[in-house]
Structures are given as C-alpha cells and as structure tokens.
Amino acid sequence: MIPTMTSAGWAPGVVQFREYQRRWLRGDVLAGLTVAAYLIPQAMAYATVAGLPPAAGLWASIAPLAIYALLGSSRQLSIGPESATALMTAAVLAPMAAGDLRRYAVLAATLGLLVGLICLLAGTARLGFLASLLSRPVLVGYMAGIALVMISSQLGTITGTSVEGNEFFSEVHSFATSVTRVHWPTFVLAMSVLALLTMLTRWAPRAPGPIIAVLAATMLVAVMSLDAKGIAIVGRIPSGLPTPGVPPVSVEDLRALIIPAAGIAIVTFTDGVLTARAFAARRGQEVNANAELRAVGACNIAAGLTHGFPVSSSSSRTALADVVGGRTQLYSLIALGLVVIVMVFASGLLAMFPIAALGALVVYAALRLIDLSEFRRLARFRRSELMLALATTAAVLGLGVFYGVLAAVALSILELLRRVAHPHDSVLGFVPGIAGMHDIDDYPQAKRVPGLVVYRYDAPLCFANAEDFRRRALTVVDQDPGQVEWFVLNAESNVEVDLTALDALDQLRTELLRRGIVFAMARVKQDLRESLRAASLLDKIGEDHIFMTLPTAVQAFRRR
C-alpha cells in the first residue's frame, strides 16, 4: 500500500506555527535580526563567488526564506546563498558562458531550477536515504577542499590584482606571478575586515560580525574617499524586488546542465540534512529527510525563478540563529522582511560596500569550513578515515569542484563496498560465566565445542562479498584444530541476501558435504527462510538443519 501524504507531510513547517508559544517570540525576533545582518553581506559576497552581481545573492535569498519556513522539517536551518553551491555554480558556468554576463545569469537561474526539480522529484520518490551518500570523512575532506578553492578564488579580490584561471592550482600560480602588483590599500582593507571578523567571533560571538565589519569598511571608504584611490566598490544595485520569470534557455544548455545540477543537488541535500539533524538533536527534535529534499527543491526552484542561483543550507547562519535563541522558522520570516526593506529602501548603502570587504568575508567563511578538530578526530579513530578525507580534499583541488563532488561520491561508495566486501567475521565459543556464544578472538578463555564450528559473517550477503564469505568460511574450517563434523552458520547478520550470495552458500554447503561435514544454519529469520525456499536451498539444507537459536543448534549437534 502506498502511503498518503498529508498536508503536514508536504508542509511540516506549518506545525511549528500551530504550536507556537509566546515565550519563543523574543528569541525568534532576535535571531531574525541577527541572521538578516549576517545574511545581507554574506549573500552579496557569495554571489560574487558564483560569478554573479552582488544583487543576485539578495534575489536568491528572498523566496527560499519564506518557502523553507513552510516546507522544511527543521526549525533551525537557514536556507539561502552558501559557499559550496556558489563555488560549484561558478565552476560549472564559467566555461559555458565564455564571458557573456547575460548568458551567465540565465544559466545560473536555470541551474537553480534544475537543482530544485531534481531535489523535488527525489523527495517525492522518497529518496531521502541518499543523505547518507557522503560519509563523514568524505564530507569533512570535501568542505576543506571547497574552502581552499574559495580562498584561491578571492586572491585577486582581496589584493586588487588580476588573477586568471578557474581552478585552484591555476589561480594560485597566476597570483604568484602577479604578487608584486598587489594594491596595498585594497589588501590592508581586506585584512582589517578579516581581523575584525576574527576578533568579533572570539570576543562577541553573538554579534552580527559580517554586517559590522562590512559597514565599518564602507564608512571608512566613504569618509576617506578610498574608492577614488583604487578600492573597488559594489556599485549600483537595482532597487526593489526581482520580477519572477522562467529563464530563456536552450535544450542544449539544459542537457549540459543536468549532470552538474545532480552533483550540486547531492551536496546541497546531504550537507543540509546533516546540519539540520545536528541542530535538531540538541532540542530532541526530528528531521524528515524526504521533506528536506522537497523543501530544498522548492527553494531552489524559487531562487531560479527570481534570477538567483542554487541555494543551500548555511551552518554558520543556522548556528547563529540557534545561539541567540531562535526556536522556530519565524526567525527566517523576520530576516526575510529585513532583507526586503533593505533592498527597497537602502540599495544606495549596499552600492558602497567595498568588494575587498566582501572578499574578506568569503575568506573568513572559508577558513571556518576547514575543521582541523575533525581531521584530528578522524586520525585518532582510524587512519583509513583520515586518508579518505585527505584524498577527497586532493580530488577537489586537483579535479575541480564539480568533478571533486563526483570523486567524493565515488570514494564514499568505494569505502562502503570495501566494508561490505570484506567485513568482520568470527568463530563463536562459550565463555565461562557469560551467557550465549561469543567471538573467541574477543575472549581468549572462550571454549569451542569439539567437532563443531559456529561461524558468523557480520554483513548482509550479496554479490560483493559472496566469494569472500565462501572462502573465509572454508578457511575457518581448515584452521580448526580438531576434526570438524558440523558447520553452523549464525545467520543473524545475513537477513538480506541476493541470488549470487545464495549460490555461494550452496557452493559452501556442497564443499563441506564433500568433506563429510554437515552444514546447518541458526538464527534464521523468516525473510531469510523465504529466500532460501525461493532459491530451492531449503530442501537441500534440510528443515532439520535450520535452527531458530544457537543453543538448539548446539544441542542438535551433541545429540547427533
């Protein structure tokens, strides 16, 4: 039976407003004011990272703030322009637009639409489990790579030099060759903004650091007429709100953007769900991954229709809202109202923002993406996890942002296959004073039952590990110190099987039979029993050699 979707299922955000409590209002208002002060300069900065005019960042912020408040399942998550998606947008569109700014803007909006459609369709199809497609080590390494690419993309902006190239190493090389032509007033201004942001984060973490730093830089430029001395400013920003419309794009461009859009959708959704779950857990709340897919999809469609670019969750804005007391998505609606007011009535002030200050804001955000504590945690946990994270970082730097995403997904899948293809296994024995049977490697005092091998393979059986299972099971028999008479497979971990695995199981049974060893199975659940029957293995093994528990299997061996 296909489950029906209720209105709360499609719009889970409505529930928080139905259950709204007056005592939450102060925190939500404060969070809305703070996030708006953070969002406005950040959105403008990320628009420049995406290769678009600063105004596009504000356009891309408006509709997603309203839509996510209704459709999202997280009460804390902040949606809008974000560093990774902005950088991926630039990586995808720069080669396609070839310097045509109008075409670039059309492609950016189209990319947002495609990302949204992919997420929306995936959410409708209940593919929320894809949130686990990127493992933690891969995500940590990917974000570190993104951060380094973000910094390299801003080298020209914060130094006033001309930096060529669209990838990390080409940008670093170009900057190295032009470092003698640094425009020192621009560089000093950028470093001052970066220093102020760092100090505010340390000494006043609840303060809206970005807006304070950028406004301070703007006042300095205006008072000292620094724009006349070579410091670039944003320039004219259209006042008012964007007029929604479908971008005029060709079928050829749509085809070219489909695969990049899928890559951006994966990163957007995965990062968003991980962030939402982390903050929801602090308050004992739950996040619906399928609802998140639909919400992020709708937000990106709206961003595309309002001449923006792909949007995602922002962990920094989410954390800021949480720390100042935000309890529901009302804070996003308040932030939305402030963004609209600024766009309508204060576009002249935005025009005076120094480009170098926005670049410093991007560098500051990038530095916060490099989580050294997570790298240290990976190193302490398992060396292979650390190497996986470093390999992902190297893939992003060497292959570029988009192909780095594909490499990240591939590395996650390969790591999963490696674990499935060669999982832990164990021979079980009895431990004095402890009920049940346990791994003899974990308990040196464990005693085997002479003539009986009880074997457990700790993974679902499938094509990826079928041969590994058969080979290791026979190795256990060969290494047994006594004469093996029975082999009992503890199937508690083997509920999921495919035909390749059952063929390997039958080959194992046949080989053991040839050696005069009885093959039996214990802890066989009903689903596995049905699979054995469908593959005609149940009769071959024999109902009298299929046991519900390990003790009954051992008793049967002793009564043989």
Curated annotation (Swiss-Prot):
Pfam families: STAS, Sulfate_transp. GO terms for cellular component: plasma membrane. Its main location: membrane. The chain crosses the membrane at residues 29-49, 51-71, 79-99, 105-125, 138-158, 184-204, 207-227, 256-276, 333-353, 355-375, 394-414. Residues 442-557 form the STAS domain. GO terms for biological process: transmembrane transport. Keywords: Cell membrane, Membrane, Sulfate transport, Transmembrane, Transmembrane helix, Transport. It is a multi-pass membrane protein. It is found in: Cell membrane. PANTHER family: SULFATE TRANSPORTER. Belongs to the SLC26A/SulP transporter (TC 2.A.53) family. This is Probable sulfate transporter MT1781. It comes from Mycobacterium tuberculosis (strain CDC 1551 / Oshkosh).
